[in-house]
Amino acid sequence: MLDPTLLRQQLAKLAECLLTVRGFTLDVAALEALESERKRIQVHTQELQSLRNSKSKAIGQARSKGEDVSALMAEVAAFSDDLKASEIALEEIRTELEKVALDIPNLPQQDVPLGADERENVEQARWGVPRTFDFAIKDHVELGACHGWLDAESAAKLSGARFTVLRGPIARLHRALAQCMLDLHVSQHGYEEVNVPIIVNADSLHGTGQLPKFEEDMFSTQLGEHRRYLISTSEISLTNLVRNEIIEADRLPLRMVAHSLCFRSEAGSGGRDTRGMIRQHQFEKVELVSVCKPQESEGEHHRMTRCAETVLEMLGLPYRKILLCTGDMGFAATKTYDLEVWLPSQGMYREISSCSNCGDFQARRMQARWRNSVTGKPELVHTLNGSGVAVGRAMIAVMENYQNADGSITVPEVLRPYMDGLSRIG
């Protein structure tokens, strides 16, 4: 959520900026009307509260002198209903304003390129050279079918479209990838491993920005009156660990990593990537989350992105680093780097990691703060999140980049200790 003072004091400028850089239309007239009404009700409420306080003081003084207070009590009773109604009206209009504020996306940093969509993203760097094959290559679906490793038919019987059953060596490779990533981030990158719930409440989704705007993207479950949501990323669970907390300065930065199942409805995918495992309803991800002081978030963003890059480099997978333009960034992000891995079957790079600095946007929604050791006062933290990386897509990239002419897959050296020394599967 943006700083409310921007909505109150710089509304026209904010609306122009949001339209230009985010393509988001803010109803200025409606907001001005709401804010004007809020001020009117607040002034009226404060006047009645002041009157109540003065009358209460007068009643106390009169009682101490043994005087009759019935007339004063009658005066208080006369406006108490009005005060109660005014307080309720004030709370209602504040809730209305907050609903509007919760739908407004974050503002980009000044160095984020202006653009409408992914076509205007800016490539920052490349690593590795795509392999040249001397045989007809297969995509991951064909490779999986050769050995019965990827079973979409059974998954469809169990759950429907966009699910896959992994069998045998490929299931083992998938597990090895996740374990290897966790070990790297914990042992070498200094992240704390956290095992988090994958079912969360609505407050958690409001905190990180998935609700109320993106409810259609979420799977949910209802038990009696209690509605819960399946996480689309463990960023939700990890980041909300600091919701309504004040963190001492010497504990920052907090760096957490989790490997979890993730669930997405893919409501806005428009029928893209229906073949294979590129876009699934259920998938696994190793997620990185950092919570830090505001002045440290830019450096932390570069560090986190570098940690994700290291995963691809240790696997020997060619990739490129992309700075997203204003029109392609996520709702809560103020700056985002995507990492795209090379898929030989498609002859192109595909997203495998997205690392975002959210500034104080999520922290304000969560009331996540740190205690400034100089002033002693609580201030909003900055939050960051990034895939370190998507496990299924890493598996696809390994299958395709390490395939052999006979359909077997060479196991990357870094994964062999996790697979009892196997150098090849299939």
From Swiss-Prot:
Q: What is this protein called?
A: Serine--tRNA ligase
Q: Which UniProt keywords apply?
A: Aminoacyl-tRNA synthetase, ATP-binding, Cytoplasm, Ligase, Nucleotide-binding, Protein biosynthesis
What is stated about domains? Consists of two distinct domains, a catalytic core and a N-terminal extension that is involved in tRNA binding.
Binding-site residues, ATP: R264, S265, E266, E351, I352, S353, S354
* InterPro entries the UniProt entry points to: aa-tRNA-synt_IIb, aa-tRNA-synth_II, aa-tRNA-synth_II/BPL/LPL, Ser-tRNA-ligase_type_1, Ser-tRNA-synth_1_N, SerRS_1_N_sf, SerRS_core, tRNA-bd_arm
Q: Function, please?
A: Catalyzes the attachment of serine to tRNA(Ser). Is also able to aminoacylate tRNA(Sec) with serine, to form the misacylated tRNA L-seryl-tRNA(Sec), which will be further converted into selenocysteinyl-tRNA(Sec).
Q: Which family is this sequence assigned to?
A: Belongs to the class-II aminoacyl-tRNA synthetase family. Type-1 seryl-tRNA synthetase subfamily.
| Record pathway | Aminoacyl-tRNA biosynthesis; selenocysteinyl-tRNA(Sec) biosynthesis; L-seryl-tRNA(Sec) from L-serine and tRNA(Sec): step 1/1
Chain's gene name = serS
Is Ribosomal protein one of the keywords? no
Kindly state one GO CC term assigned in the UniProt record. cytoplasm
Record has Lipid biosynthesis as a keyword: no
Entry's Pfam families?
Answer: Seryl_tRNA_N, tRNA-synt_2b
- Oligomer and partners: Homodimer. The tRNA molecule binds across the dimer.
> Which PROSITE patterns does this entry report, sorted A to Z?
AA_TRNA_LIGASE_II
Q: Which NCBIfam families match?
A: serS
Q: What EC number(s) has UniProt assigned to this enzyme?
A: 6.1.1.11
Give the subcellular location.
Cytoplasm
A single GO molecular function, which one? serine-tRNA ligase activity
- SUPFAM superfamilies (UniProt xref): Class II aaRS and biotin synthetases, tRNA-binding arm
Q: Where does L-serine bind?
A: T233, S234, E235, E287, S387
Q: Which reactions appear under catalytic activity for this entry?
A: tRNA(Ser) + L-serine + ATP = L-seryl-tRNA(Ser) + AMP + diphosphate + H(+); tRNA(Sec) + L-serine + ATP = L-seryl-tRNA(Sec) + AMP + diphosphate + H(+)
